[in-house]
């Protein structure tokens, strides 16, 4: 549609309905907003999950370390109880006081948390002490134990006072009491390992307050902590460990801050991206309107318009061109050479012209050619090709305008018919060349037969003929006759129509036969044929004559390519080698090579690089190779020339022939 509002007077602005104007809901524009919300949600969930994971891991570690501290302290208290029980048993067994004191001193030296050991008789009188001196804090416990008259199964603990606890053990039911005083702060100081002390403060407390504590620095009230009942052995007490502030708190805070900053940056980037997307969409809308205007102008033309890139692939066609060739734009755009509207009779000429466009300078050109419509009819057209230059000044392809000049080219069609007649004559000349080659091959054995026959007649004329020499002459005549017959049979097998026969085939023998057939042609064009067989070549299942036909065709093509174009050497080498589960035959010539324009359609029918070629040889060769489940490919040769590679599979062991 056209919009005449706004802009200079008389100017018309082309718009496309639905592309410009307000949009009620633009789902694509909401994608960045959804991404922003999703990103913020994911970052928040990640931070929460990391914090929860760290907290759970810290709680689990705190509980584990608390259990370890509890077991360590309980073990040490058990050691003190065990010493007290042994001293009581020794005293009841009648051990001397001197021996008991010596054992007590040994225990005190090894366990400094045990402040002293004392013995009381059945009346509660102190009879010995290590170190010497009374212990008034334990008198009440001793009287209580003696008054009960019972023999407890384990030492009895008294109350904790000033960080000390007294434990007592009866010597016997009628005997005295052995008493030990243990310092809880000293026990914490001595028996807590350094790695616990570096991470935690340890405290033993009851309802009255802290009884003993070890902490290398003040502990915050909100610090993580874990408490475990320490009753028994100490009645009403609790063992508690408290974590210091995490040393990597600053690192965690920095990491979280970095994540938050990156999240903010990502959000800002998405906001900017969202705004840029909106501006870009508005620009795209304007561009679509401009393209619609230009498309309307192009579709109004009666001249066919066609754009293609440097390789010949079609980029654009207008309606007039589609009507010209009878094909839809969808069938043409993106299509590579050869084009469906190319006339088969002019395929070689068209390919040559495409090569000139690719290899030549980007200057305008004009030529006439023939197109084939989709209904099979052919039309004569005149094409004007001009370089397609992009906004950066680079040559991107060619823009062509095509005009139908069928009615004006009746005379040209007659001339082309004459050209086709000349082409058929050229093919007959090729057959004549084959006859010449056959005559050359037969000339040598026939001349040898004549020579041996003359020698045999001379031997017969002698008075006493040498039968041995005569026999040798006849044998050589037979060999030369077989050689001549082999030449005739080889050519006959090569040209006659026959059914393929697959059998075990020695490729080295087939290669030798192919080289012998093409040797005269090579000598005529001063080309040196050479074979290179690498390693042991396994046999393949193939038809001997068909594979020989492929090799002869490829070798002959290489020789003729070296004869017609500029060559980079005089050698044509055929290399036979094994490549994994296949055998490769490489025919390497020193000709001018194959251009990119021809390479894409080299194996198509009617495609040839020779001036008199029919363009069917390589297509037939590929069909023969594919019939043997192989492949035929080509590529450039190092130093100049072309390499054609035939790949044939090697039958697996046990596979049917």
Swiss-Prot record:
Keywords attached to this entry: ATP-binding, Cell inner membrane, Cell membrane, Kinase, Membrane, Nucleotide-binding, Phosphoprotein, Transferase, Transmembrane, Transmembrane helix, Two-component regulatory system
Cytoplasmic side: 1-26, 274-657
GO cellular component: plasma membrane
Native organism: Rhodobacter capsulatus (Rhodopseudomonas capsulata)
Cystine residue pairs: none
MF-aspect GO terms: ATP binding; phosphorelay sensor kinase activity
The gene coding this protein: dctS
Job of this protein: Member of the two-component regulatory system DctS/DctR involved in the transport of C4-dicarboxylates. DctS functions as a membrane-associated protein kinase that phosphorylates DctR in response to environmental signals.
GO terms, biological process: regulation of DNA-templated transcription
InterPro entries the record matches: HATPase_C_sf (IPR036890), His_kinase_dom (IPR005467), HisK_dim/P_dom (IPR003661), HisK_dim/P_sf (IPR036097), PAC (IPR001610), PAS (IPR000014), PAS-assoc_C (IPR000700), PAS-like_dom_sf (IPR035965)
EC number per UniProt: 2.7.13.3
Protein name: C4-dicarboxylate transport sensor protein DctS
Broad class of where this protein is predominantly found: membrane
Domain PAS: 289-361
Protein's UniProt keywords contain Chloroplast: no
Enzymatic reactions: ATP + protein L-histidine = ADP + protein N-phospho-L-histidine
Pfam families: HATPase_c (PF02518), HisKA (PF00512), PAS (PF00989)
Domain PAC: 365-417
Compartment(s) of residence: Cell inner membrane
First-level EC class: transferase
Keyword Lipid metabolism in annotation: no
Membrane-side (Periplasmic) residue stretches: 52-252
Transmembrane stretches, start-end: 27-51, 253-273
Region listing for Inter-domain linker, in residue ranges: 407-422
Membrane disposition: Multi-pass membrane protein
Chain positions with Phosphohistidine modification: 440
Ranges of residues in domain Histidine kinase: 437-652
């Amino acid at each position: 549609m056209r919009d005449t509002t706004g802009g200079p007077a008389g100017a018309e602005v082309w718009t496309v309905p639905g592309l410009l104007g307000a949009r009620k809901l633009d789902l694509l524009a909401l994608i960045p907003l959804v991404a922003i919300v999703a990103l913020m949600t994911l970052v928040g969930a990640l931070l929460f999950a990391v914090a929860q994971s760290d907290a759970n891991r810290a709680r689990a570690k705190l509980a584990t370390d608390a259990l370890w501290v509890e077991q360590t302290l309980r073990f040490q208290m058990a050691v003190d109880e065990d010493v007290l029980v042994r001293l009581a048993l020794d005293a009841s067994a009648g051990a001397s006081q001197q021996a008991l004191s010596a054992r007590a001193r040994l225990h005190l030296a090894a366990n400094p948390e045990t402040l002293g050991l004392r013995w009381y008789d059945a009346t509660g009188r102190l009879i010995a002490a290590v170190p010497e001196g009374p212990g008034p804090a334990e008198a009440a416990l001793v009287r209580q134990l003696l008054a009960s008259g019972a023999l407890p199964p384990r030492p009895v603990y008294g109350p904790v006072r000033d960080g000390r606890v007294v434990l007592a053990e009866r010597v016997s039911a009628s005997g005295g009491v052995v008493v030990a005083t243990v310092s809880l702060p000293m026990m914490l100081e001595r028996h807590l390992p350094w790695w616990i002390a570096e991470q935690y403060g340890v405290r033993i407390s009851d309802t009255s307050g802290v009884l003993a504590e070890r902490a290398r620095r003040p502990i915050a009230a909100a610090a993580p902590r874990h408490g475990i009942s320490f009753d028994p052995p100490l009645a009403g007490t609790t063992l508690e460990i408290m974590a210091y502030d995490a040393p990597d708190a600053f690192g965690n805070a920095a990491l979280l801050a970095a994540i938050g900053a990156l999240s903010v940056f990502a959000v800002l980037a998405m906001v900017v991206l969202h705004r840029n997307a909106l501006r870009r969409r508005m620009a795209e809308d304007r561009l679509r309107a401009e393209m619609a205007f230009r498309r309307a102008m192009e579709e109004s033309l009666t001249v066919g318009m066609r754009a293609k890139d440097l390789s010949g692939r079609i980029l654009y066609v207008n309606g007039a061109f589609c009507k010209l060739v009878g094909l839809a734009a969808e069938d043409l755009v993106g299509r590579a050479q050869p084009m469906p509207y190319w006339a088969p009779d002019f395929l070689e000429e068209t390919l040559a012209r495409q090569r000139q466009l690719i290899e030549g300078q980007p200057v305008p050109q004009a030529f006439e050619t023939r197109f084939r419509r989709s209904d099979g009819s052919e039309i004569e057209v005149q094409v004007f090709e001009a370089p397609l230059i992009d906004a950066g000044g680079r040559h991107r392809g060619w823009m062509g305008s095509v005009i139908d000049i069928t009615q004006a080219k009746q005379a040209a069609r007659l001339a082309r018919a004459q050209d086709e007649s000349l082409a058929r004559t050229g093919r007959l000349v090729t057959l004549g060349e084959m006859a010449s080659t056959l005559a050359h091959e037969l000339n040598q054995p026939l001349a040898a037969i004549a020579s041996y026959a003359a020698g045999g007649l001379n031997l017969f004329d002698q008075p006493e003929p040498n039968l041995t020499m005569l026999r040798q002459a006849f044998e050589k005549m037979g060999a030369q006759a077989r050689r001549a017959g082999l030449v005739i049979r080889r050519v006959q097998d090569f040209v006659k129509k026959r059914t393929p026969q697959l059998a075990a085939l020695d490729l080295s023998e087939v290669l030798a036969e192919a080289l012998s057939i093409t040797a005269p042609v090579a000598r005529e064009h001063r080309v040196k044929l050479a074979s290179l067989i690498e390693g042991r070549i396994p046999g393949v299942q193939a038809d001997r004559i068909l594979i020989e036909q492929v090799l002869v065709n490829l070798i002959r093509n290489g020789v003729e390519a070296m004869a017609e174009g500029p060559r980079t050497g005089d050698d044509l080498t055929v290399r036979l080698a094994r490549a994994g589960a296949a055998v490769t035959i490489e025919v390497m010539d020193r000709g001018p090579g194959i251009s990119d324009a021809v390479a894409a359609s080299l194996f198509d029918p009617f495609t040839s690089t020779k001036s008199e070629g029919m363009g069917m040889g390589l297509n037939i060769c590929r069909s023969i190779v594919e019939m043997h489940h192989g492949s035929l490919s080509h590529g450039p040769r190092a130093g100049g020339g072309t390499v054609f590679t035939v790949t044939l599979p090697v039958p697996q062991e046990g596979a049917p022939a």
